[in-house]
Amino acid sequence: MKQSDLNEILKKHKRWIKNEEGGEPANLQDADLRRADLQGADLRYADLRYANLQSADLQDADLQVANLRGANLRYADLQRADLQVANLQGANLQGANLLDANLDYSCFPLWCGSKGIKLDRRLFLQLLAHICAVEVDDEECKKTQEYLMPLAKQSHAAKWLFGEERGE
């Protein structure tokens, strides 16, 4: 997709977000957005299902509640992107940069499509907390959870997951 066409879609989407005349939601389903410049873009509620966003610049983008199901985000730069409540089911995040990204309440893929992603401490602890919050029936796994629990409780999600304040 040409950057000029993309910019027009983003303009209409912004109008739609603001409930202004002439606005319409961004439908970028199956779009070829490889290496697209989406830095700082407002893509809240956008349909990006199965979009090819490989190596796209999504730094500081607002992707809250965006549907990125099955999207190719390999090597995408998502630094400081807001992905709260985003649907990332089946998305390929291999090699993506998620430093300082907000993935709270998102559907994050825990499969090989997330291999090689770059996480900051906050996201790592959040994922660890979720791993420690699940019930397992294997004794070795339970012991591993117990060992990792002090670190997991440093997550900002600890109070919600474990019913207690964060450890420092």
Sequence positions of predicted segments:
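Intrinsic low-complexity/IDR segments
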Residues: M1-R35, Q39, Y45, R49-Y50, ...
